[in-house]
């Protein structure tokens, strides 16, 4: 873990970084010398904990050039780099650098949180949504970076419907991962102070009294919707973010709204299993087969072919009922695809 800068200049009210007065960078020459020493000692996996790696483009470019130079000198040496970036600030100089990295090296964590302008205003989040979408599209099409994006459910004023619209907008850009989080109460943040009695209705937030202080209801979503979303997020991790079911997810998410399609499956899966913790890949294969064929009316051969390709590609070795008689005698243990599949 390395840190080229500290602090955050943004004031998102749900985040403890909103309390920072400013952000500042450490001396660039000293930092690069320290990086060189780590690299010389064999370090190849660098996770930058900077809140905003692309805040100062001159510094970002120098750091990226440092790694490009070492990759050119030792192309056989594996390298992994993780950066957290703001999505609406990717000047051409930075894009030119990012485009030079080969697959498997860069992971970019891109916090979206919400595409709803009214919600963004309530939480003091400054984000150009059009530029954000344009830059994400560029990263998908012109870089080899693995894109980990984030959305938060339960922000003040965010309804189930508006969250669904934001999800669909993000999903259409095809990042590798969409992390679905639920708002937590962080003591001392501006949003926590706004949740006290007497605040406007959109800030009528109720949180669990036990850690991690997850929101239970807001002025825009009730307790049942929060519970539904928590289950949905768990299933999304198992199916989409795991990378195990890329082809099957293409079938599942067909329709005008990917979020609505997945929410329908999540509700059905909960009613059918009453389980979120014990769902093995084999149980998920069988559940997807039943749902896609019986509930969605898709052809059995199409569903089976997608599930078979996903299951064999994941390296799993058991025998789900839906694939009995279809599996090869020895399935290759390939694991999760390097770089992940697009969502």
Please name every model-derived segment:
Residues 8, 231-343:
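Radical SAM enzyme core and accessory elements
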Residues 3, 199, 273-277:
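Accessory C-terminal segments flanking Radical SAM cores
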Residues 15, 59, 139, 161, ...:
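Short linear interaction motif-like sites in intrinsically disordered regions of transcription factors
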Residues 32-49, 82-84, 102-114, 128-256:
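Conserved C-terminal portion of the radical SAM core fold
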Residues 58-62, 121-125, 193-194, 252-260:
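Short amphipathic alpha-helical patches
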Residues 11, 36, 50, 64, ...:
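Generic intrinsically disordered, low-complexity segments enriched for polar/acidic and small residues
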Residues 1-141:
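Radical SAM [4Fe-4S] cluster-binding motif and immediate context
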């Amino acid at each position: 873990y390395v840190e080229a800068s500290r602090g955050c200049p943004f004031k998102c009210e749900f985040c403890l970084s909103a309390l920072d007065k400013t952000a500042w960078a450490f001396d660039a020459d000293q930092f690069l010398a320290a990086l060189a020493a780590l690299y010389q000692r064999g370090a190849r996996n660098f996770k930058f904990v900077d809140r905003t790696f692309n805040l100062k483009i001159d510094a970002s470019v120098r750091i990226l050039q440092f790694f490009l130079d070492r990759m050119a000198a030792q192309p056989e040496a594996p390298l992994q780099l993780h950066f957290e970036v703001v999505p609406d600030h990717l000047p051409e100089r930075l894009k030119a650098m990012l485009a030079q990295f080969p697959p498997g090296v860069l992971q970019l964590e891109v916090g979206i949180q919400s595409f709803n302008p009214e919600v963004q205003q309530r939480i003091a989040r400054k984000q150009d949504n059009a530029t954000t979408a344009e830059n994400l599209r560029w990263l998908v099409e012109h870089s080899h970076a693995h894109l980990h994006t984030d959305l938060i459910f339960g922000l003040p004023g965010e309804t189930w419907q508006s969250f669904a619209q934001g999800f669909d907008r993000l999903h259409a850009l095809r990042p590798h991962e969409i992390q679905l989080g639920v708002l937590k109460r962080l003591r001392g943040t501006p949003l926590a102070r706004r949740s006290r009695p007497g605040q406007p209705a959109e800030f009528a937030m109720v949180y669990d009294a036990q850690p991690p202080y997850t929101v239970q209801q807001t002025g825009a979503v009730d307790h049942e919707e929060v519970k539904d979303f928590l289950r949905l997020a768990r299933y999304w991790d198992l199916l989409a973010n795991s990378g195990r079911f890329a082809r099957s997810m293409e079938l599942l998410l067909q329709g005008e709204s990917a979020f609505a399609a997945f929410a329908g499956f999540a509700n059905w899966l909960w009613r059918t299993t009453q389980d979120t913790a014990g769902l093995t890949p084999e149980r998920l294969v069988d559940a997807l087969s039943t749902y896609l064929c019986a509930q969605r009316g898709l052809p059995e051969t199409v569903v089976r072919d997608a599930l078979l390709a996903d299951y064999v590609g994941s390296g799993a070795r058991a025998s789900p009922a839906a694939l009995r008689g279809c599996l090869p005698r020895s399935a290759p243990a390939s694991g999760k695809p390097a770089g992940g599949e697009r969502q």
